[in-house]
């Protein structure tokens, strides 16, 4: 009937499929393919680069500081779903946002405390 039932943990190379793997970055970070499907906790600038991610990839950014951080674009269109603009943006203190990659050249960001 197409259903799969499992007793125990279902995992892949990044860990338990019911959890979002977390990495912590304390310096500026450029998103790379290995970041797909993860949460990046940071207090520093994030750069979203073109040609790094595949169709359907997603990365969540958690600003774990009391100040805004900058999310820059580099050779990619990054559309803020709050206003529809293709722009660099900021992520406010303790904010969280997810970036969805439509393809290698276009991504969408949505979340709390996004600015421009």
Q: Where are the predicted features?
A:
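Exposed extracellular interaction/assembly regions and N-terminal maturation sites
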Residues: 10-78, 101-116
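Terminal beta-strand-rich extracellular "head" domains
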Residues: 75-91
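Extracellular disulfide-bonded cysteine-rich modules/repeats
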Residues: 92-102
């Amino acid at each position: 009937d197409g259903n799969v039932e499992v007793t125990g943990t279902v995992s892949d190379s990044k860990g338990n499929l019911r959890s979002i793997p977390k990495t912590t970055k304390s310096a500026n970070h450029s998103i790379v393919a290995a970041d797909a499907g993860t949460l990046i906790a940071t207090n520093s600038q994030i750069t979203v680069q073109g040609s790094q991610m595949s169709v359907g990839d997603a990365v969540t950014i958690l600003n774990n500081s009391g100040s805004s951080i900058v999310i820059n674009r580099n050779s990619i269109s990054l559309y803020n779903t709050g206003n529809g603009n293709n722009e660099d943006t900021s992520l406010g203190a303790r904010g969280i946002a997810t970036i969805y990659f439509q393809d290698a050249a276009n991504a969408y960001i949505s979340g709390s405390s996004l600015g421009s």
